[in-house]
Amino acid sequence: DEYAVAIKKAGFDILTTANNHSNDRGSEGSIRTIEVLDSLKIKHLGTYKDSSERIKDYPLILEKNGIKIALLNYTFSTNGIPTKSPNIVNMIDTISMLKDILDAKKHNVDKIIVITHWGGEYKSFPDRYQRKNGEWLLSNGADIVVGGHPHWVQPIEYRKDSLNEKVIAWSL
């Protein structure tokens, strides 16, 4: 709880919660995290108490200065700890991600930003799994993909064609 308070005091107002440690403390830990973030009015995405909460709050839509964005968040793993129903941890899965991207587009957003928790630890370049899923996300509607987990900064790539500009930060 103190960590969440410190994050709030430091100025963070949005957190992604889908990562390989999402289930470390079981359902109780996941629910407690969500409740503490809600009590502090810190917006969050990636883990949910149940499907009705996910439907209500996902994708996270933000609008500022006339720019409307959708935030999506997924993880590659929960370290082998299964997610207990009714809790939800957004996993990297092309079927779910495509549905979420299409849902985000229904909100007439200017940009879709996908935050992924992926990649091998202590690697300075993206692995095959990251590349496959990152390219898939960009090809299927994500404008910006921001990865994390390797504990290293990995390359950032800018893509531009006649219609679009896209960015992928493999790991920050």
Report the location of each language-model feature.
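Acidic, metal/ion-coordinating pockets
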Residues: 1-172
